[in-house]
UniProtKB/Swiss-Prot annotation:
This is DNA polymerase IV. Residues 6-187 form the UmuC domain. Belongs to the DNA polymerase type-Y family. CDD domains: PolY_Pol_IV_kappa (cd03586). Keywords: Cytoplasm, DNA damage, DNA repair, DNA replication, DNA-binding, DNA-directed DNA polymerase, Magnesium, Metal-binding, Mutator protein, Nucleotidyltransferase, Transferase. It comes from Exiguobacterium sibiricum (strain DSM 17290 / CCUG 55495 / CIP 109462 / JCM 13490 / 255-15). GO terms for cellular component: cytosol.
Length: 360
C-alpha cells in the first residue's frame, strides 16, 4: 500500500458550475440546480455562492428558497452534464487505464504506473486539474495519497480548486485533526454513540484500543473505524464497464386483467432488480416499468431521479407510483421493471423517498 499513488478528483459544484459556465449571467450568483420551490422539488446541487446560506444537496427546494430568496433555480440538464463528464473521463484514461468513476463528477485514479511516464503523483494531479480547466472551463479539486480512503478525504480539504497531497508519513497527523464525522461512511448515529463515550476526534480513536471500539460498535464496525482512523485501506482502484441497465420481467401463463396479480408479479420482479443492483454495488437514476398487451404491443413508463439511489423503499414506492398511473385497456401478457443510468455509488448521501416528495 505504501508504494501506491492514488488520486481522487472531484469536480467543484459540478452541475451548478456547468450552468454558470454556459450562462455567464449566473456567475457569482447563488445557483440551485433542482426542482422549483413551488413544486416541492429537491436540491440536486448548488453553487458555492448558495452554499454560504447553508443550502446543500437533498434539501427541499422550498427550504432553500427560504434561506436564499434571491437564488436562481435551474432545471437539471443531465445530457449536458454527461457530455462534460465524458470529456473528463477521457482525460483520466489518457493518464492511466486504472480509473474508477464514482459518479459523473468524481473518480479514483491509480497513477503508480501511468501513460505520462511521470513519477510524481503531485505533478500528475496538477496536470489533470490544469487540463480539466483548459478543456471544460471548470475547476476540480484533487487529493493525492497512498490509499483511496485518504485521497478522497484529501480532495475535499481545500475545495474549491484545491490540491492536497498526503505522503505516507503525513497521513496519521492529518487524520488526527479531523472530527469523527469527517470519516467517510460515519453517520450521525455512529458519531453520537462515540461522542457519548468521549470520542470526538479521529485522534481519540487512534489512541484507543481496538477492543474498546469493537465493544461499542460491534466487531466489524469497530474494526472498520479503527483501520479508517489509521488510514489503512487496501482497496484497489477498480475500473469497470458501465452496465447500461438491470431488469427483470415475467410472462403470464395466460393473459390477465387481474390488477392484484399483475402488481404482485411486478413487485416480485422489482425486488429481484433491487437485489441485483445492490449485489453489483451500483446505484441507478431511472426506473422503468414495462408491460406487453395481449396483441404483443409493448408499453412503458419511467421516472428519473435528480440523484442516484439504490434504496429499496424508494425504488419500490416509485415502481408502485408508476404502476398506479397506468390505465390498462385489456389483458396483459407480460410485466417487468428495470433500472438504468447505473453508476458506482458515491459515498455521499443517496436520495430516499423523503427526498423526492416532488413526485407525490
Amino acid at each position: 500500500m505504501v508504494g501506491r499513488k492514488i488520486i481522487h478528483v472531484d469536480m467543484d459544484a459540478f452541475y451548478a458550475s456547468v450552468e454558470q459556465r454556459d450562462r455567464p449571467h449566473l456567475k457569482g450568483v447563488p445557483v440551485i440546480v433542482g426542482g422549483p420551490p413551488h413544486a416541492r422539488g429537491v436540491v440536486a446541487t448548488c453553487s458555492y455562492e448558495a452554499r454560504k446560506y447553508g443550502i446543500h444537496s437533498a434539501m427541499p427546494s422550498r427550504r432553500a428558497f427560504q434561506l436564499c430568496p434571491r437564488a436562481v433555480f435551474v432545471r437539471p440538464r443531465f445530457e449536458v452534464y454527461r457530455a462534460v463528464s465524458a470529456q473528463i473521463m477521457e482525460l483520466f484514461l489518457e493518464v492511466t487505464p486504472l480509473v474508477e468513476p464514482l459518479s459523473l463528477d468524481e473518480a479514483y485514479l491509480d497513477v503508480t504506473e501511468n501513460n505520462l511516464q511521470m513519477t510524481s503523483a503531485t505533478h500528475i494531479a496538477q496536470y489533470i486539474l490544469a487540463e480539466i480547466k483548459r478543456r471544460t472551463g471548470l475547476t476540480a479539486s484533487a487529493g493525492v495519497s497512498n490509499s483511496k480512503l485518504v485521497a478522497k478525504i484529501a480532495s475535499g480539504h481545500q475545495k474549491p480548486n484545491g490540491l492536497t497531497v498526503l505522503p505516507p508519513d503525513a497521513v496519521l497527523p492529518f487524520l488526527s485533526g479531523l472530527k469523527i464525522g469527517d470519516l467517510h461512511g460515519v453517520g450521525k448515529v455512529t458519531e453520537q454513540t462515540l461522542q457519548k463515550h468521549g470520542f470526538n476526534t479521529v485522534a481519540d480513536i487512534q489512541q484507543s484500543p481496538i477492543a474498546e471500539l469493537r465493544g461499542l460498535l460491534g466487531r466489524d464496525r469497530g474494526t472498520e473505524l479503527y483501520t479508517m482512523a489509521h488510514g489503512e485501506d487496501e482497496r484497489m482502484v477498480r475500473p469497470h464497464r458501465e452496465r447500461k441497465s438491470i431488469g427483470s420481467e415475467s410472462t403470464f401463463e395466460e393473459d390477465t386483467e387481474d390488477i392484484d396479480t399483475i402488481f404482485e408479479t411486478l413487485k416480485r420482479e422489482a425486488l429481484s432488480v433491487v437485489k441485483t443492483l445492490n449485489q453489483k454495488e451500483l446505484v441507478c437514476r431511472t426506473v422503468t416499468i414495462k408491460w406487453k398487451t395481449e396483441d404483443f404491443q409493448s408499453r412503458s413508463k419511467r421516472y428519473t431521479f435528480l440523484e442516484e439511489t439504490a434504496d429499496e423503499d424508494t425504488l419500490l414506492r416509485v415502481t408502485t407510483k408508476l404502476f398506479n398511473e397506468i390505465e390498462f385497456s385489456g389483458p396483459i401478457r407480460l410485466i417487468g421493471m428495470s433500472v438504468s443510468h447505473l453508476e458506482a455509488p458515491p459515498l455521499s448521501k443517496q436520495l430516499t423517498w423523503q427526498d423526492i416528495d416532488s413526485y407525490l
